[in-house]
Curated annotation (Swiss-Prot):
Family assignment from sequence similarity: Belongs to the acyl carrier protein (ACP) family.
Record-given protein name: Acyl carrier protein
Residues bearing PTM O-(pantetheine 4'-phosphoryl)serine: 39
GO biological process: lipid A biosynthetic process
PTMs per UniProt: 4'-phosphopantetheine is transferred from CoA to a specific serine of apo-ACP by AcpS. This modification is essential for activity because fatty acids are bound in thioester linkage to the sulfhydryl of the prosthetic group.
PANTHER family with a match to the protein in the record: ACYL CARRIER PROTEIN, CARRIER DOMAIN-CONTAINING PROTEIN
GO cellular component, one term: membrane
Principal localisation: cytoplasm
Keyword Protease in record: no
Keywords from the named record: Cytoplasm, Fatty acid biosynthesis, Fatty acid metabolism, Lipid biosynthesis, Lipid metabolism, Phosphopantetheine, Phosphoprotein
Domain of life: Bacteria
């Protein structure tokens, strides 16, 4: 799975969960500042991402996610 495929899947999940248009979500979009996600939104997104990619996201790693790109890079590292 390459970065574009991961980004596309992540963007789709974010779009649905946060009720945003996919074209509003970029690799550099910040969850809180740009996408207006609150802590509950982020928690739910993490759950959906874990389900979608069949992987556990450790809390210490998740706390470092500021942008969509951070999530994409994390998943890319884990999926090799």
């Amino acid at each position: 799975m390459d970065n574009d495929e991961i980004f596309s899947k992540v963007r789709s999940i974010i779009s649905e969960q946060l009720d945003k248009k996919e074209d509003e979500i970029t690799i550099d979009s910040r969850f809180v500042e740009d996408l207006n996600a609150d802590s509950l939104d982020i928690y739910e997104l993490l759950y959906l991402l874990e389900e979608a990619f069949d992987d556990k996201i450790p809390e210490n790693e998740a706390n470092e996610f500021e942008t969509v790109g951070d999530v994409v890079n994390f998943i890319k590292k884990r999926k090799g």
